[in-house]
Amino acid sequence: MRAFIGNLLCRPATISAKQALLWGLFWLLGGAILGWYFSVVPTSIVDYTWGRAALISYVIYGVAIWVSLALPILLVVWLVREDNIAVWEVFGRMLFAHIPITFVMLPAMFGDKLNYSLFMASPLSSQLPITYVVFMMTYVVALIVWFFYWGYVAFGHMTQLKGWRGVMLYSVAIYGSYLLSQYAIGELIRM
């Protein structure tokens, strides 16, 4: 069990770049299909109306988030690393590291879709039982920590940086990814 957990924690660094890209694409498409099926993303930002959007829009949003996550990290990797690294390796490893975020939809699959939808629309979450909110907050925070850790492991493998310098550069790249993703999603919503 200890070996399994150890392998799972360092998986973004030990998996081959091609496998990381293929698994990442599988989870990206699977997450887009699940998100489309559950229709948990608001179709209107203003009044939180819920409904179905086209499947392709979920795939486009997923790809936009993936690209906006990988571009700043690619820039930092190119600046730090002395030898060249393939663009598809950076995109593949960062897409693989994004897999834990897909698990946010699991409670909708196995639980109450209405409570899950209300939790995701934060202005409506005050109507939920406190135990459900605490469980979901813990669950979401654990997945985000897992995502950031896997991203750091993949980043450290690509840049060959460990310690505080690696953490600081990864933090800067993630902040750049956040800003870029906010811009990209904002542009997609306006289209």
What annotation goes with each model-predicted range?
Residues 178-191:
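Juxtamembrane boundary at the C-terminal end of a transmembrane helix
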Residues 24-32, 58-71, 94, 98, ...:
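Alpha-helical transmembrane spans of integral membrane proteins, capturing the lipid-embedded, hydrophobic core
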Residues 151-175:
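Interfacial loop-to-transmembrane junctions
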Residues 92-157:
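Alpha-helical transmembrane segments of helical membrane proteins, especially in multi-pass transport
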Residues 41-55, 117-128, 188-191:
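Membrane-interface interhelical loops and short amphipathic "cap" helices
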Residues 13-18, 79-89, 156-165:
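Membrane-interface helix-boundary motifs at transmembrane edges
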Residues 1-52:
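N-terminal juxtamembrane cytosolic/stromal segments of multi-pass membrane proteins
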Residues 48-115:
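Alpha-helical transmembrane segments with an aromatic anchor "belt"
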